[in-house]
């Protein structure tokens, strides 16, 4: 709780941190980005999402001992059978800047490009600037940048996304061999059912 209070004090977490620690805010941003990029109509509930609320001091110690820090990571990718999309805590090298957010895009013709900026914007200037810009656009009668697309089925398929996962169960920590994201979420549900505090 002390870490969360510290994050709120510096603007890294909202006053009500639920959207931050349960990864709901990153998932909303992922939905908007994926819908714009792929011309689909994903809903928040379609996307598997796992936050950081169950990460313990023991986990953080384990990460540091291995030279890692944990950050929320979102990914959306067009696949032949729909869209691969998920939100998960991810381990990065300890040198990764803790309070920076990064967004990377890849297009067939444009290649890879990205943006990086301070992540301490919970209710501060970047948010206020965006809200003000939206209000001015509405007042000026500008055509909205984001158009709601007529709903049509779009399958979330994470079966080809192979990652290694960190699990803590029965007081033991382990890293899996590469498994698909869907399988990892199934394992998470099973662990939480057997060990509600895991």
Segments (PLM) and residue ranges:
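Low-complexity, glycine/alanine/valine/leucine- and proline-rich hydrophobic stretches
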Residues: 89-110, 118-126, 173-182
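A conserved regulatory-domain signal marking ACT and ACT-like small-molecule sensing domains
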Residues: 130, 135-198
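Substrate-binding/catalytic subdomain of NAD(P)-dependent oxidoreductase enzymes
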Residues: 2-102
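Short hinge/gating elements
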Residues: 13-16, 113-119
């Amino acid at each position: 709780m002390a870490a969360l209070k510290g994050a709120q004090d510096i603007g890294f977490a909202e006053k009500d941190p639920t959207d931050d620690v349960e990864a709901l805010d990153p998932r909303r941003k992922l939905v908007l980005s994926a819908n714009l990029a792929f011309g689909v109509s994903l809903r928040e509930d379609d996307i598997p999402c796992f936050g950081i609320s169950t990460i313990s001091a023991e986990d953080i110690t384990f990460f540091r001992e291995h030279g890692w820090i944990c950050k929320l990571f979102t990914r959306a990718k067009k696949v032949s059978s729909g869209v691969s999309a998920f939100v998960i805590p991810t381990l990065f090298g300890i040198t990764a800047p803790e309070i920076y957010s990064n967004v990377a895009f890849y297009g067939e013709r444009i290649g890879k490009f990205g943006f990086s900026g301070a992540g301490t914007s919970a209710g501060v200037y970047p948010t206020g600037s965006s809200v003000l810009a939206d209000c001015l656009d509405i007042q000026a009668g500008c055509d909205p940048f984001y158009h709601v697309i007529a709903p049509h089925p779009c399958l979330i398929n994470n079966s080809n996304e192979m990652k290694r996962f960190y699990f803590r169960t029965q007081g033991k920590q382990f890293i899996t061999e590469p498994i698909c994201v869907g399988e990892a979420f199934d394992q998470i549900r099973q662990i939480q059912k057997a060990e509600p505090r895991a």
